[in-house]
Amino acid sequence: MYYFYSPEMFAPYQWGLERDVSYAYMPYNSFYYGDYINSLPYAYIPQNYEVQMKADDRGSWTPFSWVEKYAYAFSGPYNKAEVALTFDDGPDLEFTPKILDKLKQHNVKATFFLLGENAEKFPNIVKRIANEGHVIGNHTYSHPNLAKVNEDEYRNQIIKTEEILNRLAGYAPKFIRPPYGEILENQLKWATEQNFMIVQWSVDTVDWKGVSADTITNNVLGNSFPGSVILQHSTPGGHLQGSVDALDKIIPQLKTKGARFVTLPSMFQTSKERK
């Protein structure tokens, strides 16, 4: 039997409505089957809450037990009216500064998952992110699919980036987000043993498609719930103006609904540093 779990949300679902939004594998707003969990590729929820899964879909499922076994999460506590804005792939010289300006305007702190190669190119932007009170996370050095690299390359991607960010931001980030949301169990095990925490997302704005501010706003407002981790991007150039502009709508409207914007260390009650 499949079960749909949906905590009280800031904005109720419109049952049966398809939105341009996708999810990482996540523990809330998902369909469960035994020890496995799967989220729909789009937020299409039938009115009777039932989904017919094909047998071959099982190959793409992630064991839900990983969330319990390792320092691994998709969203925060659903009993707190908190949401976290997160931005991947930066920094750059065009959109990251615009995002920082918007966050400062709205007095909101966020978490930026940075690529090591981009941090090397734009060190002053890394320093600005840190100096303005935002949290920096590790998004690997060159954005590989970690599920397709060997163990040595995986560790090198993380440690090399950590060294760069430590030098520029003044601390070694605790938080990792794997590119594409892809990670293997042995990689999770190593990261947990090294005192990292891996955080995916529960709401994907799909801003990388170059969609409009209104589409992004509808994606976020229609799918956010207490504990939501919202995924946006601060790079690549040429596609993200809609994501920047959407912040002027997302932030005040979620605040009006009672949401507090927090960083990931605050949401998970831990340090921003790997110690």
Curated annotation (Swiss-Prot):
Biological process per Gene Ontology, one example term: carbohydrate metabolic process
Modification 2-hydroxyproline, positions: 179
Domain NodB homology span(s) in chain numbering: 81-262
Sites where the protein binds Zn(2+): 89, 139, 143
Free-text activity regulation comment from the record: Deacetylase activity is stimulated by hydroxylation on Pro-179. Inhibited by CuCl(2) and ZnCl(2). Inhibited by the hydroxamate N-hydroxy-4-(naphthalene-1-yl)benzamide (NHNB).
UniProt modification remark: Hydroxylated on Pro-179. Hydroxylation alters the active site and enhances significantly deacetylase activity, probably by creating a more favorable environment for transition-state stabilization. It might be autocatalytic.
MF (Gene Ontology): hydrolase activity, acting on carbon-nitrogen (but not peptide) bonds; metal ion binding
Reaction it catalyzes: peptidoglycan-N-acetyl-D-glucosamine + H2O = peptidoglycan-D-glucosamine + acetate
EC number(s) on file: 3.5.1.104
Active site as annotated: 88 (proton acceptor), 233 (proton donor)
Reported cofactor(s): Zn(2+)
Family membership noted in the UniProt record: Belongs to the polysaccharide deacetylase family.
Official protein name in the record: Peptidoglycan-N-acetylglucosamine deacetylase BC_1960
Organism annotation: Bacillus cereus (strain ATCC 14579 / DSM 31 / CCUG 7414 / JCM 2152 / NBRC 15305 / NCIMB 9373 / NCTC 2599 / NRRL B-3711)
